[in-house]
């Protein structure tokens, strides 16, 4: 197959073609085709065990597909690895946020970054301000609600200049008010 995906346009940021994944004899995904354009919000809906999280983990390089292809910005990705996905601008907010409870919000967001701390801080403050969120960067992560923890995870992705943010079951542990707050953040 050529570098172009069937029907792919330059507007598509992420495309998967013919993704199949088996665990033993259990076929979890079979021939999945999906594309996401710039600025698009896409929702995958299905019951438990339908393969939504498996597909997300394949896109992130956590799982290897048995068949299929992945394209990011029109470039075929031949190596399904987390580091490749991150380098190409894909970031996944896990179902259960992975924060360090005794660290501050800012420390959790900036962990793993190198550079001048004040410049990173200023960039983070600008992102938060541009979006209009209110978040105390000095607050300990252990005091955050689940929705606030997911916002911290979203900010991690934004600080990494993610082109694609994948949210794995973002509403599963949230109250109605937290769901509304999270959807507002995603819409912004």
PLM region spans:
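Glycine-rich phosphate-binding loops of nucleotide-dependent enzymes
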Residues: 2-188
């Amino acid at each position: 197959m050529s570098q172009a995906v069937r029907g792919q346009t330059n507007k598509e940021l992420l495309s998967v073609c013919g993704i199949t994944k088996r665990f033993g004899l259990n076929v979890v995904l079979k021939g999945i085709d999906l594309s996401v354009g710039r600025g698009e919000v896409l929702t995958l809906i299905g019951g438990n065990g339908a393969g939504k999280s498996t597909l997300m983990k394949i896109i992130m390089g956590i799982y290897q597909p048995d068949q299929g292809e992945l394209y990011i910005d029109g470039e075929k990705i031949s190596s399904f690895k987390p580091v490749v996905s991150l380098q190409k601008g894909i970031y996944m907010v896990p179902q259960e946020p992975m924060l360090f409870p005794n660290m501050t919000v800012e420390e959790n967001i900036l962990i793993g970054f190198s550079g001048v701390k004040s410049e990173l801080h200023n960039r983070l403050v600008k992102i938060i301000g541009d979006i209009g969120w209110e978040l105390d960067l000095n607050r300990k992560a252990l005091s955050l609600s689940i929705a606030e923890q997911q916002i911290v995870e979203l900010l991690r992705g934004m600080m990494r200049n993610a082109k694609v943010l994948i949210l794995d079951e973002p509403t599963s542990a949230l109250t109605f008010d937290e769901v509304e707050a999270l959807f507002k953040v995603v819409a912004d």
